[in-house]
Each structure stands twice: as structure tokens, then as C-alpha cells.
């Protein structure tokens, strides 16, 4: 029998003493060895909703040759865990017409609320505010159920732009969509362990013993499935069309943004562009290819009906662990070198570039101001200022800003304070967003938004959606959308900014080419 970490008698006593409904916590070690992607395809990809969250270890300029370690061997605190979520109990969709809750079955779904206010108030209301029983007090590094999903960029109209008279674009896409998960596989790469983390809701009319027995049965069922799981055999991509957008229109938008900078409207504006591919694609194959060519701190594969969100983002939008809140500004980009010598030279030139340093410093200051809004006075700190971090196709200047979360604030307040990231808008934020609204021809969708989770514990970890493809199926062809932007300042060169967007899309497009042509042809 696969026994949870708490024995049956103790669990029955703890859950049975509650006066009302409670959310409980049980963990079972499954004693299996399986790759997270194989677990995802076995448990999550055969239904309409599921997720895979992974992370690779950052490599700084102290290791100039490498980019990132593979997720299966990463051992630092961020890259230690991977998560697979399957069979969620509800889907929470927030759009301009309000909140829609889809009950997928399970006792937690009846406690999902709608929350009054903006999109983040709605998400707060959707996470049942129930007393917690048997939750760990110290280990806050793992996802313990809750809301997992995405916050689209268009949420800015609800959060910010409505106040200045801007209307949300006409799009059917939601501002946010999250699943309520009570079953999560946690892969601890440091301990080489796979655990089933269950957070069942127990009401006074429920028999806690039956709930406990159900978790035991679920752990045994999942372990049996995972022992029989085959490594995924990802499919490829058969291209039928492509639209890279107009280079001339993008460079014209860059020139217009420069005029706004010179007129004093903004210090910087981030203008993005889209590539759209059409054809038949296997999203699992695309994710497998992306995590091989561009391993990153935040790798994710979300299945939401006919949409998959496939990404490898380097940048934290906001992270909350207990009372610690963190953002991770990234600004300043150059390509990777052909070898360690050229790599170091390019990184040195990037750090010596006055324009890049000024842009980065401005966005760090913006991050400090954002964090300060929800932090106790005097607690905000800048850490790891201007480190060079290397990725498969580019090198970035990165910094970390942290603060102590105010006692009256929570993870949703921290998201409101930091969303959208200044590295995806420019500064000042609201005026920069107005200019984006004027100059970008179509809605951004998930690009520039966030992907991550809000846990039952109050913790959260949300990545900025960049280096990401959305795959929309349901028609004759699948549609793959990839988007990237560049930070525009007074002396920006439109041609160079266009090329920067190409570099930033390079990892995702390389992953597409690899499943389209094969590894050998894609590398030529």
C-alpha cells in the first residue's frame, strides 16, 4: 500500500475536529521513476485541462560556456521541483463579462467564489478561503494545490487602462483562466522522489476516513499508471503557412515610440510583434523540443481545452514565499557567442553599453517602486544587481528586487502591484501601456501576461509570459503564435530593435524547426 505521510487515525482526528469545511493536506511517496513529461502525457494530456511546470537552474557569468542545466538534474532551490497537475476540480475564467466557473467535479468546486472587483479580486474569490488542516509549516518550496493558469496581458485594461478611458480590444480571449487543482505530482529532483500531493476538501458531512482511503487508492492508481508509462513519442509539425508581420510597420512603430520618448511622454516603451505559423503540430513535441533547446527557470505546458500554452520564460513576474516578495527585472540583451571567448566579449560589451545600463537601471527602479507598494517600509532590497545570465540564444542583464510583504497584503495584491512587468511595457507604465494600445495592431493575448500558481498556503510563483508559443487547435489547421518585443529609448535603431525581436523569438522558432525538420536539419 502507498501510505500518505500522515497516518489514518491522526488524519481522521484532525479533519474530524473541524467545525466546518476545511482543506486538508496529504502527501504520498509513489516510489516510481518517471520523467515529468511522461507523467504529464500519461495523466494530464488526455483530458481538457492539465499542466506541467518545470524549472532549470540559472547559470551566471561565472560559467561563461553553459546556458542552463537540464531540469532533471537541477538542485538549486528554484529548479528543485517539477509539477504535473491533472483532473482539476474547477476552471475559473475571468473576462470582461465577469467570472465563469466550470465545475469539473469534486467537493472543492462548490466552494469556488466569484469575488467582487477586478480580475485579481475575482481570482482571490475563486480560491476557497477555507481553514487549512495538516499543512506543513516550514517547507514552502512546493506547490500544495490551488489555482494554476494564466493571466493575459489584456487584464491591464481592467487593472489600469479603464481609469484613463481606454477600451479593451475586441477579443474572445479571457483576461485570466486558472484551474483549481487538488491533485499534483511533485518531482523532487534533489531527492529523486515523486510524490502525490493531495489537498482534498473535507466537509462536516464527509467521513474523513473515506477521504483518507480515497487518497490512498488514488496514490496506488497513479503509481501503477506511472510504472507502466512509456516515454512520450512526440510528433512533429507540418507547416501550411506563416505570417511574420510587416517589418516596415514594426520599424515605423519604433520610430513613433522614439518620438514619444523625445517628447517626454515616456522614458522607454516596449513594442512587440508576432509571428504566426499554421499547420498540424503536436504541442507535447513542441514543449519537449523547447525544453531541450532553451531550458529556462520557468518552463510550462498548460492545456486549456483547445489551447496549449508552451513556454520557457526566464523572468519572474512576482514570487511570494511567506512574507517575502520578489521580482526579477531583465533588460539588456545580446546574442550568444560561438564559443566562450566570444561569449565573454559580447557579455562585456553588453555591460559596458551605456544605453543598456541606463535602461536596466530604470527598470530596476520601477521594480523597486512596484515591490515597495506592498512591502513594509525600509524592507525593499536590490540583489544580484546586473548579473549576466545566459540562455540558448541570448544573454541578458538581470537583477533581483525583494521586499517583506506587508501584513495587510497577499499574493494577489503583490501581483496587482507588479503587473504588468515594466520590462514588457516601459516606463512610466500607464502612459507606456497607452502607447502600446495605440501602436500595436492586435491584442497581445498571453504574451506579456503571467503563468503560474496561487497556492492554498498563500504563496505564489508567477512568470512573465515571454519565449512562449500558444497553440490553438480545433480548426482545419493548428495556429502557433509567437511574440516578442524590444525596449525602445531615444537612441534606438529601428533595424536593430527588429533584429532583437527575432533573437528573442529564436529559441521558440528553433524548437518549432526541430520538430518540423528534425535536429540535424534545424541546426544547419
Swiss-Prot record:
Its cofactor is Mg(2+). It is an enzyme of class 4 (lyase). Its EC number is 4.1.3.27. Heterotetramer consisting of two non-identical subunits: a beta subunit (TrpG) and a large alpha subunit (TrpE). GO terms for biological process: L-tryptophan biosynthetic process. The gene is trpE. Part of a heterotetrameric complex that catalyzes the two-step biosynthesis of anthranilate, an intermediate in the biosynthesis of L-tryptophan. In the first step, the glutamine-binding beta subunit (TrpG) of anthranilate synthase (AS) provides the glutamine amidotransferase activity which generates ammonia as a substrate that, along with chorismate, is used in the second step, catalyzed by the large alpha subunit of AS (TrpE) to produce anthranilate. In the absence of TrpG, TrpE can synthesize anthranilate directly from chorismate and high concentrations of ammonia. Binds 1 Mg(2+) ion per subunit. Mg(2+) binds at residues 359, 500. This is Anthranilate synthase component 1. Keywords: Amino-acid biosynthesis, Aromatic amino acid biosynthesis, Lyase, Magnesium, Metal-binding, Tryptophan biosynthesis. Pfam families: Anth_synt_I_N, Chorismate_bind. Feedback inhibited by tryptophan. It comes from the Archaea. Pathway: Amino-acid biosynthesis; L-tryptophan biosynthesis; L-tryptophan from chorismate: step 1/5. Belongs to the anthranilate synthase component I family. L-tryptophan binds at residues 55, 297-299. Chorismate binds at residues 332-333, 447, 467, 485-487. It comes from Haloferax volcanii (strain ATCC 29605 / DSM 3757 / JCM 8879 / NBRC 14742 / NCIMB 2012 / VKM B-1768 / DS2). It catalyses: chorismate + L-glutamine = anthranilate + pyruvate + L-glutamate + H(+). GO terms for molecular function: anthranilate synthase activity; metal ion binding. The keyword Lyase applies.
Amino acid at each position: 500500500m502507498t501510505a500518505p505521510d500522515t497516518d489514518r487515525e491522526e488524519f481522521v482526528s484532525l479533519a474530524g475536529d473541524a467545525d466546518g469545511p476545511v482543506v486538508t493536506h496529504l502527501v504520498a511517496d509513489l516510489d516510481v521513476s518517471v520523467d515529468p513529461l511522461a507523467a504529464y502525457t500519461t495523466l494530464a494530456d488526455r483530458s481538457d485541462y492539465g499542466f506541467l511546470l518545470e524549472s532549470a537552474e540559472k547559470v551566471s557569468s561565472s560559467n561563461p560556456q553553459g546556458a542552463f542545466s537540464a531540469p532533471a538534474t537541477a538542485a538549486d532551490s528554484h529548479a528543485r521541483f517539477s509539477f504535473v497537475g491533472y483532473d482539476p476540480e474547477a476552471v475559473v475564467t475571468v473576462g470582461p463579462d465577469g467570472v465563469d466557473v466550470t465545475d469539473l467535479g469534486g467537493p472543492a468546486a462548490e466552494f469556488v467564489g466569484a469575488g467582487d472587483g477586478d480580475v485579481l479580486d475575482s481570482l482571490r474569490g475563486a480560491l476557497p478561503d477555507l481553514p487549512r488542516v495538516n499543512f506543513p509549516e516550514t517547507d514552502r518550496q512546493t506547490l500544495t494545490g490551488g489555482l494554476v493558469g494564466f493571466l493575459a496581458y489584456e487584464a491591464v485594461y481592467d487593472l489600469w487602462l479603464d481609469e484613463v478611458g481606454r477600451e479593451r480590444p475586441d477579443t474572445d480571449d479571457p483576461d485570466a483562466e486558472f484551474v483549481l487543482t487538488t491533485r499534483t505530482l511533485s518531482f523532487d529532483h534533489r531527492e529523486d522522489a515523486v510524490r502525490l500531493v493531495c489537498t482534498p476538501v473535507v466537509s462536516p458531512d464527509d467521513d474523513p476516513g473515506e477521504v483518507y482511503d480515497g487518497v490512498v487508492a488514488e496514490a496506488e492508481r497513479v503509481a501503477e499508471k506511472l510504472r507502466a508509462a512509456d516515454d512520450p513519442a512526440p510528433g512533429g509539425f507540418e507547416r501550411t503557412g506563416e505570417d511574420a508581420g510587416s517589418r516596415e510597420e514594426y520599424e515605423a512603430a519604433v520610430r513613433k515610440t522614439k518620438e514619444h520618448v523625445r517628447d517626454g511622454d515616456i522614458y522607454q516603451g516596449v513594442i512587440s510583434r508576432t509571428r504566426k505559423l499554421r499547420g498540424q503540430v503536436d504541442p507535447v513535441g513542441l514543449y519537449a523540443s523547447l525544453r531541450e533547446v532553451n531550458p529556462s527557470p520557468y518552463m510550462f505546458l498548460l492545456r486549456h481545452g483547445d489551447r496549449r500554452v508552451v513556454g520557457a520564460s526566464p523572468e519572474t513576474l512576482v514570487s511570494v514565499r511567506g512574507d517575502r516578495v520578489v521580482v526579477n527585472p531583465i533588460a539588456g540583451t545580446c546574442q550568444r557567442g560561438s564559443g566562450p571567448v566570444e561569449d565573454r566579449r559580447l557579455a562585456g560589451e553588453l555591460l559596458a553599453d551605456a544605453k543598456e545600463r541606463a535602461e536596466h537601471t530604470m527598470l530596476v527602479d520601477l521594480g523597486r517602486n512596484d515591490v515597495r507598494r506592498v512591502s513594509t517600509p525600509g524592507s525593499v532590497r536590490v540583489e544580484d544587481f546586473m548579473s549576466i545570465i545566459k540562455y540558448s540564444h541570448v544573454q541578458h542583464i538581470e537583477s533581483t528586487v525583494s521586499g517583506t510583504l506587508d501584513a495587510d497584503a497577499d499574493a494577489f495584491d503583490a501581483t496587482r502591484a507588479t503587473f504588468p512587468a515594466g520590462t514588457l511595457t516601459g516606463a512610466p507604465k500607464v502612459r507606456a501601456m497607452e502607447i502600446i494600445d495605440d501602436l500595436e495592431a492586435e491584442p497581445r493575448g498571453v504574451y506579456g501576461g503571467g503563468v503560474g500558481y496561487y497556492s492554498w498556503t498563500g504563496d505564489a510563483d508567477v512568470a512573465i509570459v515571454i519565449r512562449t508559443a500558444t497553440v490553438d487547435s480545433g480548426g482545419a489547421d493548428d495556429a502557433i503564435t509567437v511574440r516578442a518585443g524590444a525596449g525602445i529609448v531615444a537612441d534606438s535603431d529601428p533595424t536593430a530593435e527588429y533584429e532583437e525581436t527575432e533573437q528573442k523569438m529564436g529559441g521558440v522558432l528553433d524548437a518549432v524547426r526541430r520538430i518540423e525538420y528534425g535536429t540535424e536539419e534545424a541546426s544547419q
